Every structure is written in C-alpha cells, then in structure tokens.
C-alpha cells in the first residue's frame, strides 16, 4: 500500500510549514503540496490527486465552506477541517460536517503541543483516507429502512441505547437521532470529535431532534427521551440510568 497523499490548504504560512514538517516525519504520509487559498488548491487537486485534504475554514478570496461545497459536488475528497477553538469556528465546523467534511482538528496553539497536534492529525489523516465518501452518502440517503428498525427498537426496549461513531459519522448520527421518537430510551453517544466541538455539536442536534441532546457531564441521568454525547476526547463519563 502506498503512502497517503495529503494536500494542505491554509492561508497561514506558519500553519502550512508546521503541518508539512511534522507530517513528513510519518513514513506512511506524503505531503504532495500546499496551497494558500482555494484557487491554488483547485489546480493542485487536479494535478496532484491527493487522498486527503486539510482545509482551513477562514481564508481570503474564497472561504473554506464555499470551497468545500464546490469540492464535494465536483471532486469529493476526504477533508479534515482545521478550525479555531472559538464559537464562530465551532459553528462553521458543524456546517462543514453537513457539507461533507469527515474530521476536524483545532489549529495549533496553547491548548496542546505541536507534537500532540501532529500525532492527532496523522491519525485523523489515516482514518480519513479510509472513508468512502460515495458509500457514506448512500448510507445517509438510503438509510430509511434501518432508521425504522431503530425506531422499532426504541419503542420496545427499556434499556439504554449506546451509539459509537467515528470518522465521517456525524451525518449518519444526525440521520439516526432525528428519527428517534420523544419516548425513546435514554441514549449514550461517543462521537470521534475533539474537545470544544462536542458542545456545539450537541446543541445543534438538540435543535433538530425530537429528543433532547446534551453534552454529558459526570453523574448525568440517562432518561427517556434524552441523549448524552460524551465530551470530546473523553469517553469515560459516568452516568446513571433514571427511567
């Protein structure tokens, strides 16, 4: 199996340099190019045919979300969003997931070391390279029979429903939860997503689902009509069953 070809798209020369240098240390990853904006990225995608793209959201000339829409329509490639840990960044990241992004990582900063960042990003790149975007879209679009099965389960069980979702799973998770009836059993969810982004994700789901969705805290009760989403980077919260 060949190396995973990665294109870095970011208007920050510092971020491009850090990502290129750090990711080049991994023998299974090859940085085939960098681009300061979507226009340069467009040409490099055609010429270099990367397996994975890392994409900054806030860029001049064309923002990352607009570019991602065009990319997913004409040349779908597994894309990792590089976002700031701000409310605006979180909101735009969730919109990017709706469009088709498969992963997110926070921009390098004081929250973690460059070494931590590079290890996390390398893992996300490996996971993203295995995502079949065409298959993923078919599952979301044609998943009605499976959703009906889940609804039947919700109406017949008095147990807790546990859901685990990894890279590329946000849209499938949304498709499942929006079909859950208000009287469904309590649900616990682990979604592969960094800290600081799960709060916004839970709030977004809560606004579109019949059930209540919130980011879990220790000692929360798992009750009927409630879904608890594990905080990012933490899958070990403690909850009590309270039907």
Briefly describe each language-model feature range:
Residues 2-7, 13-20, 24, 28, ...:
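Conserved acid/base catalytic micro-environments in cytosolic active-site loops
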């Amino acid at each position: 199996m060949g190396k995973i070809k990665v294109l870095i798209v970011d208007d920050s020369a510092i971020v491009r340099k850090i990502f290129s240098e750090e990711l080049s240390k991994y023998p299974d990853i090859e940085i085939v190019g960098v681009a300061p904006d979507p226009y340069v990225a467009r040409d490099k995608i055609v010429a270099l045919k990367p397996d994975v793209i890392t994409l900054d959201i806030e860029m001049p000339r064309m923002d990352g979300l607009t570019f991602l829409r065009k990319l997913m329509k004409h040349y779908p490639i597994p894309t990792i969003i590089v976002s700031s840990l701000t409310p605006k960044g979180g909101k735009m990241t969730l919109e990017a997931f709706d469009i088709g992004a498969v992963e997110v990582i926070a921009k390098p900063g004081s929250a973690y070391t460059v070494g931590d960042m590079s290890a996390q990003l390398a893992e996300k790149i490996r996971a993203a390279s295995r995502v079949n975007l065409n298959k993923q879209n078919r599952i979301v679009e044609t998943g009605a029979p499976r959703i009906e099965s889940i609804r039947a389960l919700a109406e017949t069980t008095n147990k807790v429903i546990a859901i685990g979702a990894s890279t590329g799973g946000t849209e499938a998770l949304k498709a499942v939860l929006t079909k859950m009836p208000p009287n469904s059993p309590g649900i616990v969810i682990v979604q592969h997503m960094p800290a600081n982004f799960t709060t916004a994700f839970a709030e977004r789901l809560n606004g579109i689902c019949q059930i209540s969705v919130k980011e879990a805290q220790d000692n929360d009760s798992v009750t009927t009509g409630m879904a608890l989403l594990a905080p990012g980077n933490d899958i070990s919260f403690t909850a009590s069953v309270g039907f």
